[in-house]
Amino acid sequence: EALADPIADPVAGPNPEADPEAINLKAIAAFAKKLLG
């Protein structure tokens, strides 16, 4: 988790036991949606 992208942290949500890779994918998707509108 310490190596994760800082941008992913607030997007990951309150479930620290979730798959880190899945969280990262969701974070990237959410960030992309914010960038693309």
From Swiss-Prot:
This protein's record includes keyword Transcription regulation: no
InterPro entries assigned: Mastoparan
Tissue specificity of this protein: Expressed by the venom gland.
Alphabetical UniProt keywords: Amidation, Antibiotic, Antimicrobial, Immunity, Innate immunity, Membrane, Repeat, Secreted, Target cell membrane, Target membrane
Modification Leucine amide, positions: 36
AXPX repeats: 4-7, 8-11, 12-15, 18-21
Single biological process term from Gene Ontology: defense response to bacterium
One CC-aspect GO term: membrane
Family (UniProt): Belongs to the MCD family. Mastoparan subfamily.
Protein name, per record: Mastoparan-VT
Source organism of this protein record: Vespa tropica
